[in-house]
């Protein structure tokens, strides 16, 4: 089993939920928050298991400040990092370090928008070996439809006093 416990700044338990051991923290959050909501929290300070787009959107929409930790980029270490690819909100595309646009193709059922490069251009790219390992030389980038909420959480994390607040977690 897995126990989720919400505490106040003094460490007193305010609410808890117990879930099956195979339930991820993010899936257990709604039941725990339902018990916390009547207390009208201003901040929710949580570990990286809760640092997902749906929880970020949920809290921000309810005007509750999420204080969530930095999470390392996942993926292969010898490939380009996500921060090296720039999302252009105006044109809804992703720009690679070689200034080529990865254009929007589809949105998955899980809420991820897929952006793909032109394989003909990528085949001759000097960064191909550190960009993609695909056989057809096509870079595919996914961006969640609620990624902007995660970016807001990242901005909050850097605000004055948030590091100290997070240490009370």
Residue ranges of predicted features:
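Anion-binding and metal-coordination hotspots
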Residues: 1-169
